[in-house]
C-alpha cells in the first residue's frame, strides 16, 4: 500500500553521491545513496554538502585556471573575477666565479618579478544558485553539489552491483543528510530495492516523527542509528537539536524488534576523552535489548575540512587531527565489555596512524 507522501517515478530529487563498494555503511559490500537535506547542524558533519535541501556549488580553487568565465556568466555580480597580483620570486643560484684562492662555489639569492592571478571570489550572500557559473566553467572548478535524479535512475545504479550484494551479504543503504527528512523519497527507494530483492539499511540520526519511521519498517532490514552524545545539553550545542526524540525513537524501534546498529562518532571537544559517553551508550544499548546487533565506533576524520572550504564555509574543527583505532581503545573496551553486541572501529580505511 502506498503512502500519501511517497513520490512517483517521474519526480526528481537531489542526490549528492551514489557510493559503490561502500564497506562502512552496513554489512557486506553496499551501495550508499546520499540524499540532500538534514534538520541537524552537526559542527563536524563529514557531508556538509548534504545539509541544505537545495542545490549548491562547490568551488575548487586548485582546479581553477583563472580564466574569469564564471564571473562573466554571473547575472548577479556575485563573482569577483581573478585578480592580477605582482610579486617576486626568489631563487638560489651557484656563483661559478670564485674569488682568487677560493675553491668553493657561492650560492647567491636572486629575485625576479612574477605575475600571479588570485582565484575568483564567490559572494555566497549574492548567489542565487542559478548555476550559470557551473555551465561556464569548463575545468571542473565550479560544480553542483548534487544531481537531480529519478527513482529509476537511482535503482539502475544500485542494481548494477546486485551480484556483489549476494556474494557478500551486502545491499543498499540510504544516507545523507538525513533520509527521514525526505520520507516520500526514502519510502519509494526502499520499496523499489526490496522489490528487486536487495537488502536495505537506513543511516539516520533518528530525528523525525515516529509515524515517518513506522512507514518505512516494512521495507527495512537494518537501521544504522547515529548516537552523537546522550548529554542533551551537549547535543543541542553541537547539533542544534535535542536528543529526546532520537532516544524515544530508538526505544520504539527496539519494541518492534527491528535490528539496529548504534554508530558513535567520536569527536574532539564533543565526546573524545569523555568515558562517560561509552558507558551511557552501553546503558542505552542494554535498554534496547536484542535489537542492537552491533555498535560501531567512528573516529573523527578531517575529510570534511576541504568540503567546507569548497562550500565557502567556516569549519569549527579546522586543523584538528584525525583519530585512529589506537586512540579509542578505552572506548572499545568499555563497549565490548558492556554486552554481547559486535563492536567495530571505523575510520579511514587503510590509513594507519603515523609513528
Question: Model-predicted segments: where are they?
Answer:
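ATP/adenylate-binding site constellation spanning eukaryotic-like Ser/Thr protein kinases
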Residues: 35, 47, 76, 139, ...
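Residues that scaffold the ATP/ADP-binding catalytic core of kinase and kinase-like folds
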Residues: 41-45, 73, 82, 136, ...
Amino acid at each position: 500500500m502506498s503512502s500519501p507522501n511517497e513520490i512517483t517515478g517521474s519526480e526528481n530529487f537531489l542526490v549528492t553521491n551514489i557510493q559503490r563498494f561502500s564497506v562502512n555503511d552496513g554489512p557486506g559490500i553496499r551501495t550508499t545513496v546520499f540524499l540532500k537535506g538534514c534538520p541537524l547542524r552537526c559542527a563536524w558533519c563529514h557531508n556538509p554538502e548534504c545539509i541544505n535541501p537545495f542545490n549548491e556549488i562547490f568551488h575548487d580553487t586548485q582546479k581553477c585556471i583563472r580564466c574569469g568565465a564564471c564571473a562573466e556568466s554571473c547575472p548577479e555580480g556575485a563573482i569577483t573575477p581573478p585578480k592580477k597580483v605582482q610579486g617576486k620570486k626568489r631563487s638560489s643560484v651557484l656563483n661559478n666565479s670564485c674569488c682568487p684562492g677560493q675553491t668553493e662555489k657561492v650560492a647567491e639569492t636572486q629575485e625576479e618579478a612574477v605575475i600571479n592571478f588570485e582565484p575568483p571570489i564567490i559572494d555566497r550572500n549574492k548567489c542565487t544558485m542559478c548555476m550559470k557559473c557551473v555551465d561556464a566553467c569548463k575545468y571542473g572548478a565550479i560544480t553542483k553539489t548534487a544531481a537531480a535524479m529519478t527513482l529509476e535512475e537511482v535503482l539502475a545504479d544500485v542494481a548494477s552491483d546486485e551480484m556483489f550484494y549476494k556474494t557478500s551479504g551486502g545491499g543498499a543503504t540510504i544516507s545523507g543528510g538525513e533520509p527521514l527528512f525526505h520520507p516520500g523519497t526514502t519510502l519509494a527507494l526502499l520499496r523499489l530495492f526490496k522489490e528487486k530483492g536487495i537488502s536495505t539499511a537506513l543511516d539516520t540520526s533518528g530525528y523525525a516523527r515516529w509515524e515517518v519511521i513506522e512507514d518505512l519498517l516494512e521495507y527495512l532490514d537494518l537501521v544504522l542509528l547515529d548516537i552523537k552524545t546522550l548529554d542533551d545539553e551537549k547535543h543541542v550545542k553541537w547539533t542544534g537539536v535535542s536528543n529526546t526524540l532520537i532516544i524515544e525513537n530508538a526505544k520504539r524501534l527496539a519494541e518492534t524488534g527491528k535490528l539496529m546498529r548504534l554508530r558513535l562518532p567520536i569527536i574532539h571537544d564533543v565526546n573524545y576523552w569523555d568515558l562517560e559517553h561509552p558507558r551511557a551508550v552501553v546503558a542505552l544499548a542494554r535498554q534496547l535489548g536484542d535489537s542492537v546487533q552491533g555498535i560501531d565506533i567512528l573516529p573523527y576524520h578531517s575529510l570534511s575540512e576541504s568540503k567546507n572550504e569548497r562550500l565557502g564555509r567556516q569549519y569549527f574543527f579546522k586543523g584538528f587531527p584525525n583519530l585512529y583505532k589506537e586512540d579509542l581503545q578505552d572506548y572499545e573496551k568499555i563497549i565490548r565489555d558492556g554486552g554481547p553486541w559486535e563492536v567495530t572501529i571505523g575510520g579511514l580505511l587503510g590509513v594507519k596512524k603515523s609513528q
